[in-house]
């Protein structure tokens, strides 16, 4: 193919052209007519020549009436007729006038004619049924001679090109179109017709060429274009953007193609309306119309938009300008509304004015200027010496509405200005007037009284004290408390920040005299210190913090006698406690009390309002001092504490135990802290971001990614972890080789930009994990909070989750001995016993989702309980685990949850025992899903009527019997984790007992129901339910159980008064009584579960033959009822 006057296309691209013609929008063609015989009204008098005879009347000009004419004026049309079959070998020619070709490069000759068949004549001398058409091109518009002469034509006949030989195609008139390429320098043409003994009526001759009409596509305008000289030519069309439009992509040509058929298409390029103009559809395709006043449009394909608030525009505007006094920030888009700077702060006051300091506070401005952000700046101006003034937390970009000012001079006047700012404040010309001003005068040194006074010991115990103090300003609630050994050679101390007027120190050394002092945070004035020693009370303060070592030795000598006396007292108390514990051994524990509601527990939680943060000097302290000063619990705690509070446990009970006591610490609910960050400091170890790194992402969670990483062995966190691992056994499975400088750890990250709530929940999980230290509970190493992203660093478990490990092992055909499985279950039970002894709260907000997926395995196949997250999103449909069953109190994993926890929201250690039974079934089935593909509602209804999971294939009956023990409906009949540990320990010592069923199993119940083809249940005699199942309910109770109590009246009105009557009613009868089809199916499923003992909706064992139907035997689904 040839692209005329532009570029040459490969001939093999014809298929591509056809595809373009089919897919791209095609514009209609246009014909430019050069000659039309039907439109000629006068005589033609065309030249004619008979080469082989001396005749000049072979072609006769006649008139005929065209019935298809569009108007009466052209109904009678000129035509040429010839019929010379009686001539011998004729060659008769007819020549048209000269026809100007204009800009045509290819012309089309459309002929309308009719002929007669030769067999219509008896004895023709020379008869033909075809005629020929010729064309000759001329380089001039007016040739010298127009008359055709016979002699000259005979010599010139070779210059006439034969363009077609035509014959009739039907019995009526035939239309044929011939195409001919025109040379670029041709001005005129003549058409000739040769007949050689044919009866022919030449009714019409139409000569034209094709033009691709002008068109607009995607705001690109293309002018009319003549088609190319060849039938396969495509002529390039250069487009241009319509007015008020420009190219969408600069540099891309606007190109179209004019096909030989006269159809134009756009192939590349696109235009968009300019800024301030919007695209409007019209009859030509589209146009760009200017945006009206108070609207705007940037460049692109969007429509005109109304101006944002506080802005206006003129016609054809690309953006809106802000009204006077309104602005946009430099980083804001033109679509954002215009805003103002905030007004001045209000109610600026100075509090706690002393000789050298004061605290300024103010309220938010009355107008924020329509913007969400605001910050404050404070300036010392005018009066007073401002060079020594120090502002905390600073004087620029303050997000709080208060500032502590220190460094003032006594008895001096100062002026302070407070400005409110936002992102547009810098553009406001009169900003200096938008401020609040206050004048103050500091006190003299004589009248300046320290704000903290009357420091005293409020309560004391054998190893701790509570100190309290008074303040002159009741609004102050942020204090800094310092404690230090009063008699040491080195100046070592520790500080903590509290928000109450008391705090507690526990684990104090009876041999040490401690000195305490308090001040308001950010205030340089300390209270008068007090010194205190356990067993001796308040001591007179030494004249100096540094005394001779001999003085220290004299005091320690006298303290030895006190220590010996204390040891004797402790031994006596311990003996008394043992006697008391034996007497109360069978008493019910606090955590099992049913009457202690959640709201009552919350109201009896002891005070946790203080926080302990190590001072930056803490590196110089003795190693035991941090352990001694950990408690924040007030000594005079409530007499009836909530479960898990420190005082509910045997002493010592100041938030923990002595490091060497060997007893479990009690679990502390992080949500009882007023500031969750305080709990994070107390129970976790902060890791430097430089000591931890991420190597790869191995999973994802709600808050962020779960990654594999490393922890530097030289870091304090690694050293602390190594000590704990030495104490309780090596933890995770990827601890790193000895030659490597890092430990392999698991890292859970928080997504950048997470909300404050998400971050608090994320770190609360770390606070929970940080309280646990057990070989079968996942171990927290520390947290990273000083850099993004925030991380939780825990030990790495190389074998992943327990359920996935079992499934993979089973798929690979590897065998795990039942002895090893028993050891795994022993480890899970051990970890659960530890959590129960810790007092880990059994409430839905802290629900322990005990399932095989939340148990991890290390390299030694040691099981560790994990996943202590507070907030779990509902899993997607694509997950392997069905979404949790949601109630008003939270989300419950129904398949693992005890019945009383689902129905009554009662979570106790017995609830965890039920879940542990399901875990046993998961492990014995090698990761199979509990209750298979049943819905949550079906699981609930089946469990409530006594259904229990059947034993997995090849499962030892000893293990399955333990699971059944855990699934007792009455929670008080279930075993404790202590009992479970004893049983598993026995199995480990005597593996042969695993295969032995130590007790009588519940009776296996087979379905006795039969369904006919119409869905009714045929029950001859209602079978006796299992001994432990509920009795047959009344009709009303049964309908309530399946959620159809609203149809009770319909059934009773149709003489159905019992469940037996309902069981003998067919599906069609139920429909006739007014029940919907879905309700009938629910009744049938409920009857299957009630009568047969098989799960509702499952197939019965036998379908009886009724009403002439055939007997079928679907697969049997069996279960156990208890």
UniProtKB/Swiss-Prot annotation:
Regulation of its function: Dephosphorylated by daf-18.
Sites where the protein binds ATP: 698-706, 748
Composition-biased stretches (Low complexity): 1092-1112
Residue ranges annotated as Cytoplasmic topological domain: 581-1122
Glycosites: 172, 238, 244, 499, 554
SUPFAM superfamilies cross-referenced by the UniProt entry: Fibronectin type III (SSF49265), Galactose-binding domain-like (SSF49785), Growth factor receptor domain (SSF57184), Protein kinase-like (PK-like) (SSF56112)
Enzyme Commission number, as recorded: 2.7.10.1
A single Gene Ontology CC term: axon
Quaternary structure (record): Interacts (via kinase domain) with daf-18 (via C-terminus); the interaction is independent of vab-1 kinase activity.
Record protein name field: Ephrin receptor 1
Taxonomic lineage of the native organism: Eukaryota, Metazoa, Ecdysozoa, Nematoda, Chromadorea
């Amino acid at each position: 193919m040839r692209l005329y006057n532009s570029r040459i296309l490969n001939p093999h691209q014809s298929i591509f052209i056809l595809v373009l013609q089919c897919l791209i929008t095609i514009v209609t063609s246009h014909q430019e007519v050069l000659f039309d015989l039907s439109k000629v009204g006068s005589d033609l008098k065309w030249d004619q020549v008979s080469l082989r005879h001396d005749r000049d009347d072979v072609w006769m000009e006649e008139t005929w009436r065209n019935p298809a004419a569009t108007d009466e004026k052209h109904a009678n049309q000129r035509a040429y007729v010839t019929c010379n079959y009686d001539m011998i070998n004729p060659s008769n020619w007819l020549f048209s006038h000269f026809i100007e070709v204009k800009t045509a490069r290819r012309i089309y000759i459309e002929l309308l004619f009719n002929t007669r068949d030769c067999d219509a004549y008896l004895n023709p001398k020379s008869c033909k049924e075809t005629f020929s058409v010729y064309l000759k091109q001329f380089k001039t518009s007016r040739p010298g001679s127009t008359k055709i002469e016979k002699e000259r034509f005979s010599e010139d006949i070779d210059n006439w090109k034969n363009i077609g030989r035509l014959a009739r195609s039907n019995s009526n008139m035939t239309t044929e179109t011939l195409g001919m390429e025109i040379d670029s320098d041709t001005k005129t043409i003549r058409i000739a017709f040769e007949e050689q003994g044919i009866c022919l009526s030449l009714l019409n001759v139409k000569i034209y060429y094709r033009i691709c009409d002008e068109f607009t596509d995607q705001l690109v305008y293309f002018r009319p274009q003549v088609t190319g000289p060849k039938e396969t030519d495509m002529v390039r069309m250069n487009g241009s953007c319509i007015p008020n439009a420009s190219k969408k992509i600069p540099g891309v040509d606007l190109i179209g193609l004019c096909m030989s058929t006269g159809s134009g298409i756009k192939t590349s390029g696109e235009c968009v309306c300019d800024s301030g103009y919007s695209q409007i559809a019209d009859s030509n395709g589209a146009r760009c119309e200017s945006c009206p006043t108070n609207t705007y449009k940037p460049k692109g394909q969007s429509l005109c938009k109304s101006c944002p608030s506080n802005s206006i525009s003129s016609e054809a505007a690309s953006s809106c300008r802000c009204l006077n006094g309104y602005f946009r920030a430099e980083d804001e888009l033109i679509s954002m509304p215009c805003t103002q700077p905030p007004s001045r702060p209000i109610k600026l006051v100075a509090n706690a004015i002393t000789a050298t300091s004061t605290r300024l506070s103010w309220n938010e401005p009355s107008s924020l200027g329509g913007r969400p952000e605001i910050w404050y700046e404070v300036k010392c101006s005018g009066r007073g010496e401002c060079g020594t003034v120090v502002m905390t937390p600073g004087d620029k970009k303050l997000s709080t509405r208060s500032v502590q000012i220190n460094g003032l001079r006594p008895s001096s006047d100062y002026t302070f200005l407070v400005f409110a700012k936002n992102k547009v404040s810098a553009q406001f010309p009169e900003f200096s007037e938008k401020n609040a001003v206050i004048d103050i005068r500091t006190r003299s040194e004589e009248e300046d009284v320290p704000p903290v006074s009357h420091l005293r010991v409020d309560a004391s115990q054998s190893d701790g004290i509570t100190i309290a103090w008074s303040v002159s300003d009741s609004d102050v609630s942020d204090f800094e408390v310092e404690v230090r050994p009063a008699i040491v050679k080195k100046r070592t101390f520790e500080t903590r920040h509290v928000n109450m007027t008391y705090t507690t120190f526990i684990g104090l050394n009876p041999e040490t005299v401690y000195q305490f002092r308090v001040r308001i945070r950010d205030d340089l004035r300390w209270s008068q210190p007090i010194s205190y020693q356990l067993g001796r009370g308040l001591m007179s303060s030494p004249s100096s913090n540094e005394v001779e070592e001999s003085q220290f030795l004299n005091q320690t000598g006298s303290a030895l006698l006190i220590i010996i006396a204390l040891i004797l007292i402790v031994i006596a108390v311990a003996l008394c406690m043992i006697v008391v514990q034996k007497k109360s051994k069978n008493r019910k524990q606090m955590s099992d009390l049913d009457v202690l509601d959640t709201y009552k527990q919350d109201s009896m939680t002891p005070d946790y309002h203080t926080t302990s943060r190590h001072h930056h000097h803490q590196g110089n302290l003795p190693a035991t001092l941090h352990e001694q000063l950990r408690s924040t619990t007030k000594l005079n705690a409530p007499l009836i504490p909530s479960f898990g509070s420190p005082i509910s446990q045997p002493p010592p009970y100041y938030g923990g135990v002595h490091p060497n006591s060997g007893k479990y610490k009690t679990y502390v609910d992080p949500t009882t802290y007023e500031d969750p960050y305080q709990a994070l400091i107390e129970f976790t170890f902060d890791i430097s971001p430089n000591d931890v790194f991420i190597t790869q992402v191995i999973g994802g969670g709600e808050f962020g990614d779960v990654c594999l990483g490393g922890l530097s062995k030289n870091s304090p966190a690694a050293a602390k972890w190594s000590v704990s691992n030495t104490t309780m056994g090596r933890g995770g499975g990827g601890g790193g080789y000895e030659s490597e400088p890092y430990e392999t750890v698991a890292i859970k990250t928080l997504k950048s930009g997470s909300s404050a709530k998400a971050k608090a929940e994320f770190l609360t999980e770390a606070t929970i994990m940080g309280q646990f230290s057990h070989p079968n509970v996942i171990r927290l190493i520390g947290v990273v909070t000083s850099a993004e992203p925030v991380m939780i660093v825990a030990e790495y478990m190389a074998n992943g989750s327990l359920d996935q490990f079992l499934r993979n092992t089973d798929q690979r055909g590897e065998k795990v001995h039942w002895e090893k499985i028993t050891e795994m279950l022993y480890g899970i039970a051990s970890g659960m016993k530890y959590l129960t002894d810790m007092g880990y709260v059994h409430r839905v907000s802290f629900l322990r989702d005990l399932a095989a997926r939340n148990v991890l395995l290390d390299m030694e196949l040691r099981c560790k309980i994990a996943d202590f997250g507070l907030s779990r999103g509902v899993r997607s449909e694509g997950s392997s685990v069905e979404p949790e069953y949601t109630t008003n109190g939270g989300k419950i994993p129904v398949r693992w949850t005890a019945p009383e926890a689902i129905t009554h929201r009662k979570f106790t250690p017995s609830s965890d025992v039920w879940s542990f039974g399901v875990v046993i079934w998961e492990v014995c089935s090698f990761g199979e899903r509990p209750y298979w593909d049943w819905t949550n509602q079906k699981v609930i209804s089946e469990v409530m009527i006594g259904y229990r999971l059947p034993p997995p294939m090849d499962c030892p009956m000893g293990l399955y019997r333990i699971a059944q023990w855990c699934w007792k409906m009455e929670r008080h009949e279930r075993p404790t984790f202590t009992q479970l540990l004893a049983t598993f320990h026995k199995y480990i010592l005597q593996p042969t007992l695993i295969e032995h069923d130590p007790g009588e199993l519940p009776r296996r119940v087979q379905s006795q129901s039969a369904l006919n083809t119409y869905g009714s249940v045929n029950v001859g005699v209602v079978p006796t339910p299992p001994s432990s199942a509920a009795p047959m309910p009344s009709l009303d109770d049964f309908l309530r159980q399946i959620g159809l109590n609203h149809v009770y009246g319909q059934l009773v009105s149709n003489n159905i008064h019992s469940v037996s009557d309902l069981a003998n009613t067919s599906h069609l009868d139920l429909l006739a009584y007014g029940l919907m089809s879905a309700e009938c199916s629910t009744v049938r499923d409920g009857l299957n579960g009630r009568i047969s003992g098989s799960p509702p909706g499952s197939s019965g064992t036998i379908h009886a033959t009724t009403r002439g139907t055939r007997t079928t035997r679907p697969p049997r689904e069996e279960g156990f009822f208890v």
